[in-house]
Amino acid sequence: MPAPTALKQAESAPLANDISLPVEGADEEFLLDAPGAEDADANVLVPVEDSNDMQIDEEGRPRFAPARDIDPVTRVETRKIPIPPHRMTPLKQSWTSIYPPLVEHLKLQCRMNIKRKTVELRSSKHTTESGALQKGEDFVKAFTLGFDVDDAIALLRLDDLYIQSFEIKDVRTMHGDSQARAIGRIAGKDGKTKFAIENASRTRIVLADSKIHILGGFKNIHLARESVVSLILGKPPGKVYGNLRTVAARMKERF
């Protein structure tokens, strides 16, 4: 112990050799006790100015900001469906049953533009489904082709329904009375032939002059189309009924 009268020496900084080094395994124990302590500094968000420079960390890896929840509908989209002149009156009469599925089920905004003869659909902030606009367009188009509202609503509820359209001239070239007789064979007396094809194939058929529209599943449309083509080519309705019964029985056995 120095004498009380001795000069006091200034405290010198410890040399590098005197600094105690961490014992091997100490870091491991610290990490086990405090998980995530190593990345504490790396997780600190630093305000970044708007620049094109990529932010990287000490190891050269790019650093990205945390992901944010973004509304699935990023922008407003609009569809305009033209309405044929002969379907404007049915559209006005059935409008009260057409717009509720579009607004309540698909969460779309819709309006009927009488001046331009179109139905306008628009997505909104409440729209959650990405394909809602396309479904709404298919629903309105099905009505413009001549399908009932109840049948067209099935396009909104089921994903595996389609509409296939073709003309009589695509099957066989006909003019005048021969074409009228072909349409009569497809419809039948009081529409019995058409109803029989619809019930057997589980489809819906619309006869619009020389155009034929079929709504249903892929295999069901194929069955109904084969029956309609056979009638156009002149096959007797009795044979068509027989083929329908056979194929319908096979379809029931499958399911």
UniProtKB/Swiss-Prot annotation:
Query: One GO molecular function term?
Result: RNA binding
- Where does the record place the KH domain? 179-228
Task: Return the InterPro entries for the record.
Answer: KH-I_PNO1_first (IPR055212), KH_dom (IPR004087), KH_dom_type_1_sf (IPR036612), KH_PNO1_2nd (IPR055211)
Write out the annotated subcellular location: Cytoplasm; Nucleus, Nucleolus
What keywords is this UniProt entry annotated with?
A: Cytoplasm, Nucleus, Ribosome biogenesis, RNA-binding
Among the record's GO biological process terms, what is one? ribosome biogenesis
Gene3D superfamilies in alphabetical order = K Homology domain, type 1
Q: Which SMART domains match?
A: KH
Q: What is its main location?
A: cytoplasm
Give the CC-aspect GO terms: cytoplasm; nucleolus
Superkingdom of this protein's organism: Eukaryota
Role: Required for small ribosomal subunit (SSU) synthesis. Has a role in the processing of early nucleolar and late cytoplasmic pre-RNA species.
How would you summarize the oligomeric state and partners of this protein? Component of the small ribosomal subunit, ribosomal RNA processing complex (SSU RRP complex).
Write out the similarity annotation. Answer: Belongs to the PNO1 family.
Q: What is the official name of this protein in its record? A: Pre-rRNA-processing protein PNO1
Q: Which organism is it from?
A: Gibberella zeae (strain ATCC MYA-4620 / CBS 123657 / FGSC 9075 / NRRL 31084 / PH-1)
